Design a protein with these regions (language model features):
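Short, solvent-exposed amphipathic alpha-helical segments in soluble enzyme
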Residues: 20-24, 85, 114, 175-178, ...
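Glycine-rich oxoanion-binding loops at beta->alpha junctions
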Residues: 70-83, 265-279, 303-339, 479-495
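Active-site phosphate/pyrophosphate-binding segments
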Residues: 253, 259-289, 379-501, 573-590
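Short helix-capping/linker segments at secondary-structure and domain boundaries
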Residues: 12-13, 134-140, 167-169, 409-418, ...
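Generic C-terminus detector
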Residues: 549-590
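Conserved short alpha-helical segments that host acidic/polar catalytic motifs at enzyme active sites
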Residues: 1-246, 250, 255-259, 265-266, ...
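Acidic/histidine-rich
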Residues: 153-187, 448-474, 509, 516
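Glycine-rich phosphate-binding loops that contact phosphosugars or nucleotide phosphates
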Residues: 283-424, 458, 505-547, 565
């Protein structure tokens, strides 16, 4: 899992690549590297650590040239070392490669290639430059050698290659891993996503599975893996680049938390006709299945409740990574709703491919227009919440909920009413941000030494217990467990002891009496209770106030307090909430 970028133009590559990698840092990484091409030589700089530190250690003057590639890496094959950082080169340092994905047949290839060429790393990626070199040594020109090598690779990959044997050119290939071109005047880019090149061009071309591209600074040509040319129209990227900056905030996470009232209002700008058409299709489907991972799965669980309570339609939620094991009943009468912020999540993409192979209709809820998932879907709804840079989902989660509410209200013929209610909710969230932040920061301080947290809720808020626990795990590195409160006595109660923090989501809806009873059981065992409710209760040691709303809307007024609790808990522990260890924003491998 990583971010990749390739540049060819008329300006020195290193600063452009460095800045591009900085914009890709949000994807998560443990090492970084750059290779440039100049005067018949590949210049290489790579190491474990942050982009700025890696480049500083190498000295920019040692990376000349107007063609280059850059990489930020999360280790999947090989430990975190300089040797395993990208780019990887052939033995003569004439070919440099960066790669996102997993080469599934790398052991077979390595066993063959190691008889001819010396390997320097433990990664699967290093087979690629040696494989290209093997084809060159067999007598092929470099371009033909590149295509011959790509055809031998199995697995998922987005690769970019430069070589002294093809000066001034970039070569790239994609299979099951995102790739997009940035087309400018006397400059071209290829990378993982548009943020990497957005300051330089807004014209983009999305590369599909099974395609390669050959680029110079003023031309590009797309091919299939058999080297047959293909045509593709470009699209204009409308994202505001300023949204990808922190502004006056110390972290992206708190900036994106505070953007959520505006995000809800933006979500209400959806096309009513499309929402109504999609609602009709949902109602006509024999079965409706949500497919998602992580925070998106918790949004789907809430969507299931809202579809039932408001839309009077049963649906199911299956983890994307498990979908293939439960897809026996999927057929042409199935509607799959795939949810992914990036639109590139590998497990979701794999599930969608399986669903489409069985004839299912696929709708997607995504943030990134032009993403792989949106292009694969029969219809797509866009979150339109702007770039989300913090690794932990915040505003994208809330935007996902809003679109699910809109679909449910459209299913019940009350779309306009649903929009009016959500507009009211956005104002209530804004008030909560103004009134609760200081109190929540104080609560985080009180619990900064705790290592185990339990989040309890019932009904529609059950998924919020899971989401709250996930946020705390992601940014604070503590054990946190979200569960239906009724399950507490079926095992987890054995873990409650004196001082154990229990976060209870218990608005005064139809679940109130039951969850108060469950909390009381925890209190008797010594739990310290943080209550999130519209009313205080004697069982609470700490109270985070939320407004009173209709039962189905409590997740929307609960989400911000949970996010703030996680954010401030990270801050008081001295952690960077934007870059949780071991996690990536866009999980593009299975």
């Amino acid at each position: 899992m990583c971010g990749i970028i390739g540049y060819v133009g008329d300006k020195p590559a290193v600063e452009i690549l460095k800045n591009a990698l900085t914009r890709l840092e949000y994807r998560g990484y443990d090492s970084a590297g750059i290779a440039t091409l100049d005067n018949g030589k590949v210049h290489l700089c790579k190491n474990k650590g942050k982009v700025a530190d890696v480049i500083a250690d190498c000295n920019i003057k040692n990376l000349p040239g107007c063609t280059g590639i850059g990489h930020v890496r999360w280790a999947t094959h090989g430990t975190v070392t300089r040797e395993n950082a990208h780019p990887h080169c052939d033995a003569s340092t004439e070919i440099a490669v960066i790669h996102n994905g997993i080469i599934e047949n790398y052991e077979e290839l390595k066993n063959r290639l190691a008889k001819k060429y010396k390997f320097q790393s433990d990664t699967d990626t290093e087979v690629i430059p040696h494989l290209i070199r093997e084809q060159v040594d067999s007598g092929l020109n470099f371009e033909d050698a590149f295509f011959a090598a790509v055809r031998q690779l199995q697995g998922s990959f987005a690769i970019i290659v430069i070589s002294t044997l093809a000066d001034g050119k970039l070569f790239a290939a994609r299979k099951d891993s995102p790739m997009v071109l940035g087309i400018g005047k006397d400059v071209n880019f290829v990378g993982s996503d548009v943020l990497s090149f957005l300051p330089y061009t807004r014209e983009a071309v999305y590369i599909e599975d099974g395609e390669c591209v050959v680029m110079t600074k003023n031309s590009f040509q797309i091919y299939d893996f058999d080297h047959h040319p293909k045509q593709r129209a470009s699209v204009n990227i409308t994202w505001d680049l300023s949204e990808a900056g922190k502004g006056d905030y110390p972290h992206f996470m708190i900036k994106e938390i505070k953007e959520q009232p505006a995000v809800i209002r933006q979500a209400l700008m959806q096309d009513d006709r499309q929402l109504n058409r999609m609602a009709i299709d949902i109602l006509r489907s024999r079965q409706v299945i949500f497919v998602a991972c992580g925070s998106s799965r918790f949004a789907a669980l809430i969507g299931r409740y809202v579809f039932s309570k408001v839309g009077h339609t049963f649906s199911d939620v299956i983890m994307a990574s498990e979908f293939g094991y439960f897809s026996d009943s999927v057929d042409k009468n199935t509607l799959v709703i795939a949810i992914s912020q990036s639109g590139e999540t590998a497990d979701v993409m794999n599930g969608v491919k399986q669903a489409k192979a069985k004839g299912a209709t696929v709708y997607s809820i995504v943030n990134v227009e032009g993403s792989s998932l949106s292009r694969m879907s029969d219809k797509a709804l866009y979150l339109s919440c702007g770039p989300e840079i913090g690794v932990a989902a915040t505003k994208s989660f809330t935007a996902q909920l809003c679109l699910l509410y809109l679909l449910a209200y459209a299913m019940d013929g009350r779309l306009i009413e649903g929009k009016e209610k959500l507009l009211e909710i956005s104002s209530l969230i804004e008030e909560g941000l103004q009134n609760n932040t200081t109190e929540i920061a104080a609560i985080a301080e009180k619990f900064k030494d705790k290592k185990d947290f339990y989040f309890l809720a019932r009904g529609i808020n059950f998924a919020m217990a899971g989401e709250g626990a996930l946020k705390l795990k992601e940014v604070c590195y503590v054990h946190a467990e979200g569960m239906a409160a009724g399950e507490l006595k079926h095992g987890t109660l054995a873990l409650i002891e004196d001082g154990t923090p229990v976060v209870a989501i218990c608005p005064t809806d139809y679940t109130y009496a039951d969850i108060v009873s469950n909390i009381s059981e925890a209190v008797v065992r010594g739990a310290t209770v943080i209550g999130i409710s519209n009313t205080n209760h004697s069982v609470f040691n700490e109270w985070i106030k939320i407004p009173e709303v209709e039962m189905v809307f409590y997740p929307l007024v609960t989400v911000v307090p949970l996010q703030l609790l996680a954010y401030h808990s990270a801050i008081v522990r001295g952690l960077d909430p934007d870059k949780p260890r071991n996690l990536a924003k866009s999980v593009t491998v299975k």
